Amino acid sequence: MKTLLRCSRMVDPGRGIDGAYDLLIDNGVFVQVGGDFDASGAKIVDVPPDWVVCPGFIDMHVHLREPGQEHKETIETGTASAVAGGFTAIACMPNTDPVNDNAGVTEFILAKATQANKARVYPIGAVSRGSLGKQLSDIAELRKAGCVAISDDGYPVADALLMRRALEYADMFQMPVIDHCEDLSLKGDGVAHEGFHASALGLRGLPAVAEELMVER
């Protein structure tokens, strides 16, 4: 079945599109964009003028929680929520139980994502075993299993030598390292950005230098 969307505004930065275009869909597949093509027999849908038609969004920081924390989220529910909001691809952090620091967990996540058959899922492996910041994960194994990047998610890698090795190995496999830049010894028990407003509210401040030092490193 063919459907013709008449769009008041279509945006596709990759193709330099930003304006009023028609979009022809054939059996769920986008087949043609423009305004001069054969759409005979197609169902015509006028897209509301305040809507924007664009390619699916990508979320690079998602907590799917499965395996191990299904009471918070599952791959099924997380990917369903993603596509409902227009996100057709997501990268999931390794904060699972067990942590995604080996091929077995990565393959489990990908199998579950295939079974859910909704958003595309790109696993992010852990920098360190168990995200404990002590022993480097097998980055080659994670890459081979399907990880697209490495990160210890919300845990900063305090060991500078471990981070250096992670960067060196990740570079060999052309994998980004997503770092949580925060020096916990400087953060202390702060709960708000250090400054006038934190002081006025009586809140312990978080100094900006706690993040800046980790970035500079």
Give, region by region, the residue ranges found by the protein language model.
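Divalent metal-coordination and catalytic microenvironments
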Residues: 8, 23, 28, 50, ...
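Metal-associated gating/positioning segment near the N- to mid-region
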Residues: 51-113
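Divalent metal-dependent hydrolysis catalytic cores, especially in the metallo-beta-lactamase
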Residues: 77-100, 117-129, 143-158, 174-182
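Active-site metal-binding motif and surrounding structural segment of the metallo-beta-lactamase
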Residues: 37-53
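Active-site mouth loops of central-metabolism enzymes
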Residues: 60-73, 94-96, 122-135, 202-209
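Short, acidic/polar
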Residues: 71-79, 131-141, 217
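Histidine/acidic residue-rich metal-binding segments in metalloenzymes
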Residues: 136-217
